[in-house]
Amino acid sequence: MNGRSSNSKSDEKLTAPTLYIFPHAGGTAKDYVPFAKEFSGEVKRVAVQYPGQQDGYGLPPLESIPGLAEEIFAIMKPAARIDTPVALFGHSMGGMLAFEVALRFEAAGYRVLALFLSACSAPGHIKYKQLKGYSDNEMLDLVARATGTDPEFFNDEEFRVGVLPTLRAVRAIAGYSCPPENKLSCPIYTFIGSKDWIATREDMEPWRERTTGDFSLREFPGDHFYLNKNLPELVSDIEIGTLQQFDQI
């Protein structure tokens, strides 16, 4: 790529960086194949399949974002090499998980080049965070009132078994928080859609407080899934950011 330095590394050959891709809630690794294919061969891409997703789709079993991140990191760690720099990208809920996993990578001594967050509100700025304290029955009652459904319908055990995991996942996402002292040393680069009401500029700006490194925010035209129509530009930003950090090793 233009502007890459040849004298910032020592003579030994470094392993190409790995970019871990964290899908949105309900998304799968397969959904991000077009995204991954936009990159050049200079960056290895690994799309994360969340543990526990039934038949490879739907929301994973989720009691808390940090809990799922811990499980994901435990799965990733045996295959991750300490001498291979990593970067992480996450969209929406995937951004929360990417941040938590990045914290774990840094704590374990891995070199994290950068964290890329897309349409993901910062901890403490997530919509509907009041849902964190809701019980299962209160969540069901909220759905009944919001949809006009007869509350008696939710007494059906088969229906409850089917819908409650999703509601618990929504509750966990809405209630995600993280101690303010938990920060990364790598840069955080953020991206939003101009018409996204789920994660706004005001919701994402506080991510700058979660790194001791650089921070940037870029706005693309579009809504919460703006990336579908802006893949080449988004991927270019991510690849350039990753390789620039790689060149500084």
From Swiss-Prot:
Reactions the enzyme catalyzes: a fatty acyl-CoA + H2O = a fatty acid + CoA + H(+)
EC numbers on record: 3.1.2.-
Disulfide links within the chain: none
Keyword check for Cytoplasm: no
Superkingdom to which the source organism belongs: Bacteria
Swiss-Prot/TrEMBL GO biological process terms: lipid biosynthetic process
Alphabetized InterPro entries for the sequence: AB_hydrolase_fold, PKS_thioesterase, TEII, Thioesterase
An MF annotation (GO) of this entry: fatty acyl-CoA hydrolase activity
Matching Pfam families: Thioesterase
Disruption phenotype: Deletion of the gene leads to a drastic reduction in PDIM and PGL production. Mutant shows increased susceptibility to several antibiotics. Mutant is highly attenuated when injected into the zebrafish embryo bloodstream, but virulence is retained when bacteria are injected into the notochord. Deletion leads to an increase in growth yield in vitro.
Keywords noted in UniProt: Hydrolase, Lipid biosynthesis, Lipid metabolism, Virulence
Active site: 92, 196, 224
Effect of residue 92 to A: Loss of activity
EC class of the enzyme, as a word: hydrolase
Protein role: Involved in the synthesis of both phthiocerol dimycocerosates (PDIMs) and phenolic glycolipids (PGLs), which are structurally related lipids non-covalently bound to the outer cell wall layer of M.tuberculosis and are important virulence factors.
PANTHER family: S-ACYL FATTY ACID SYNTHASE THIOESTERASE, MEDIUM CHAIN, THIOESTERASE
UniProt similarity note: Belongs to the thioesterase family.
Protein name as catalogued: Thioesterase TesA
Organism encoding this protein: Mycobacterium marinum (strain ATCC BAA-535 / M)
